[in-house]
């Protein structure tokens, strides 16, 4: 810390009292001129090695000099985590928030920052420092194109902005640094040494990989540590957790039994608090938790996932079995990481996970301040396979990071629309110039694998994409270049994919009368809709039958159809328990799917308006509300008008008193289960107003 200015040392000492000295990786950055220089920097150091503190040091320097900072992250969960961490700075007069207009340090998700670069140029031009956390995601299919395009626009509109990229180590760092015009600080320091090993069934004389995981768990139980186990699918998270819980339950020390039961009780309370009995998935989770094992996937209630994460941090869970998506969204280090599955299913069949993903999962092992070492175990079926995996993953090199902006066609279309709608590009030449400045363009024209046809390739991709957008009436050509149609402007100002917009536009053009059930089904077929998935291979006839009841005759039944059936039941006030039992789906995610469907219905309404179709507006507003609140039409005024009432209590009120509540007294309302004096008063005030 001695190398930092006194005022900065004071702030950091107050906000991060556990940090006494900079670690070797942080010192190497300071010694490389990171604090004094205005150059762009890529900080490439391992997980948990202090990247965030280096970001804060740069941010403090900028704010102390009167500047503004935007700190970008990939996910809302990380945004909330960072804001909570940075709030300590407010004690020193530094404003922290999500809005760059009112914050000295604004924490934004990538998509929000991308939107800022399109339409909020004045704000962007006031930003002095852009910090890009999890920058290594620039090679990821979905978010990578967003990162590189937003950075490119930001540098075009505000050439003086300084960029600090916080990243894992990438194999082609020099190439990436060339694009960013950045200096690179790489260091292999880890606060907790990491031991990586491949285990196989033959070592332990067992037949199944699950039994190898059990051996690791038993060792963790002996030394009082915790384990994260990664598998490839939701179903495997549950089957592994159940297997381990069954095997370990008789070996749990008495002093742990009660705390495990308390955690199990907490997850069972979640559906009850939402008016639903626990689903079979909830019951299975609670049963596993009584043995200290949790499974973690998107098919659980959000609150249940939060409980699992918090209790794991507090040491009240021995092991979490999870899919690899956990490594991106949640900061959950543990002493031991087990990677049971090293393949994932693709359209071409099973494929090995990248070395980069293996590194990210392994990097979770070892908790700073708690562990003297971290242990990562990859599981193989045989000794020969173990040797192969050791060569591939432990000794192998991380793959070269490449731009995905052309591979992800929707990302290409969205960035072209953004450029045209914002007035930054109007011709194919100007669009090609924009893409020339992206990471994709740098790799095509200046990278080590570039060739003399790089610019021609960019021009070709742009021309193909603009033709597609003109065919779909998103762009139209004029004497001075392209302009965005009303439809194109709507897409540019939304967060929806071009494919979603085109599908909904097509449906609106073919629709004579409003059929809300057909609309729900069409929404589930858009790529922006989070789907509710089947739990196993049980009969799918109940889903087919439910859709047939509402005039939807379908031969093939998959997750899209399951989601449509679940949403139809949701707006008819069925509980998650009833939906799961009826259709054999992960119904805990119904609420999230319904929320997203509600927003897509509003987007569909805007599409109808720009097409001049207004006769469905009222029905669409009603459907959006029904999806959002999960109610029949008669309950909408009550759940909308009385904040926090919820659909269960609203239905009890309507059943008891009918829809006309003008003459119902507060004492009568309080007789209904779940309604206390405060809520009764709120209901009366609502009735008096309306």
From Swiss-Prot:
One of its GO terms (biological process) is DNA repair. Residues 208-417 form the Helicase C-terminal domain. It catalyses: Couples ATP hydrolysis with the unwinding of duplex DNA by translocating in the 3'-5' direction; ATP + H2O = ADP + phosphate + H(+). Keywords: ATP-binding, DNA damage, DNA repair, DNA-binding, Helicase, Hydrolase, Isomerase, Nucleotide-binding. One of its GO terms (molecular function) is 3'-5' DNA helicase activity. Disulfide bonds: none annotated. A motif (DEAH box) lies at residues 133-136. Monomer. Binds replication protein A (RPA), in presence and absence of DNA. Belongs to the helicase family. Hel308 subfamily. The C-terminal region (about 633-690) acts as a brake for ATP hydrolysis and interacts with RPA. This is ATP-dependent DNA helicase Hel308. The gene is hel308.
């Amino acid at each position: 810390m001695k190398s930092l200015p006194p005022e900065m040392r004071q702030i950091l000492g107050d906000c991060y009292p556990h940090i006494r000295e900079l670690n070797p990786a942080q010192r190497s950055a300071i010694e490389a001129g990171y604090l004094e220089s205005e150059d762009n920097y890529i900080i490439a150091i391992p997980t948990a090695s202090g990247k965030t503190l280096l970001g804060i040091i740069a941010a403090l320097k900028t704010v102390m000099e009167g500047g503004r900072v935007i700190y970008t992250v990939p996910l809302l969960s990380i945004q909330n985590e960072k804001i909570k961490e940075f709030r300590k700075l407010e004690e020193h007069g530094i404003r922290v928030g999500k809005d760059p207009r009112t914050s000295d340090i604004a924490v934004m998700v990538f998509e929000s920052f991308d939107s800022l670069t399109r339409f909020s140029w004045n704000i962007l031009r006031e930003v002095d420092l852009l910090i890009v956390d999890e920058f290594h995601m620039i090679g990821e299919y979905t978010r990578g194109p967003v990162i590189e395009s937003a950075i490119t626009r930001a540098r075009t509109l505000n050439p003086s902005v300084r960029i600090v990229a916080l990243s894992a180590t990438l194999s082609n760092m020099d190439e990436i640094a060339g694009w960013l015009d950045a200096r690179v600080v790489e260091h292999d320091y880890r606060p907790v040494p990491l031991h990586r090993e491949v285990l196989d069934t033959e070592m332990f004389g067992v037949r199944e990989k699950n039994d190898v995981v059990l051996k690791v768990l038993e060792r963790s139980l002996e030394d009082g540590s915790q384990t994260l186990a990664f598998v490839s699918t939701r179903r495997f998270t549950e089957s592994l957790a159940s297997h381990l819980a069954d095997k370990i339950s008789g070996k749990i020390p008495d002093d742990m039994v009660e705390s495990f039961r308390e955690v199990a009780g907490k997850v069972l309370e979640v559906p009850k608090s939402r008016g639903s009995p626990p689903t079979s998935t909830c019951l299975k989770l609670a049963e596993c938790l009584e043995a200290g094992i949790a499974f973690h996937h998107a098919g659980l209630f959000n609150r249940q996932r939060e409980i699992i994460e918090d209790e794991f941090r507090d040491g009240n869970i021995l092991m979490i079995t999870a899919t690899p998506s956990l490594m991106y969204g949640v900061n959950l280090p543990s002493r031991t990481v087990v990677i049971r599955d090293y393949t994932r299913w693709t359209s071409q069949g099973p494929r090995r996970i990248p070395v980069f993903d293996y590194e990210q999962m392994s990097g979770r092992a070892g908790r700073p301040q708690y562990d003297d070492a971290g242990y990562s175990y990859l599981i193989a079926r045989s000794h020969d396979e173990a040797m192969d995996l050791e060569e591939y993953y432990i000794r192998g090199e991380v793959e070269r990071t490449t731009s995905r902006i052309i591979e992800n066609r929707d990302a290409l279309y969205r960035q072209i629309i953004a450029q045209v709608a914002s007035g930054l590009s109007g011709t194919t030449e100007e669009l090609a110039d924009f893409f020339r400045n992206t990471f994709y363009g740098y790799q095509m024209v200046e990278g080590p694998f570039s060739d003399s046809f790089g610019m021609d390739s960019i021009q070709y991709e742009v021309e193909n994409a603009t033709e597609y957008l003109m065919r779909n009436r998103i762009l139209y050509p004029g004497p001075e270049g392209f302009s965005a149609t009303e439809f194109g402007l709507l897409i540019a100002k939304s967060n929806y994919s071009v494919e979603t917009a085109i599908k909904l536009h097509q449906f609106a053009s073919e629709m004579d009368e409003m059929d809300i059930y057909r609309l729900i089904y069409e929404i589930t077929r858009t790529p922006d809709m989070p789907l509710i998935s089947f739990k196993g291979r049980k009969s799918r006839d109940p889903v087919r039958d439910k859709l047939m009841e509402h005039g939807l005759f379908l031969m093939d039944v998959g997750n899209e159809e399951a989601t449509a059936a679940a949403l139809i039941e949701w707006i008819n006030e069925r509980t998650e328990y009833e939906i799961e039992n009826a259709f054999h789906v992960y119904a805990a995610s119904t609420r999230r799917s319904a929320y997203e469907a509600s927003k897509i219905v509003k987007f569909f309404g805007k599409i109808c308006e720009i097409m001049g179709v207004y006769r469905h507006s009222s029905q669409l507003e009603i459907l959006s509300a029904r999806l959002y609140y999960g109610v029949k039409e008669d309950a909408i005024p009550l759940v909308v008008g009385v904040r926090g009432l919820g659909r269960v209590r609203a239905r009890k009120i309507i059943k008891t008193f009918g829809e006309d509540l003008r003459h119902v007294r507060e004492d009568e309302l309080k007789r209904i289960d779940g309604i206390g004096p405060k809520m009764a008063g709120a209901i009366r005030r609502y009735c008096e107003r309306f």
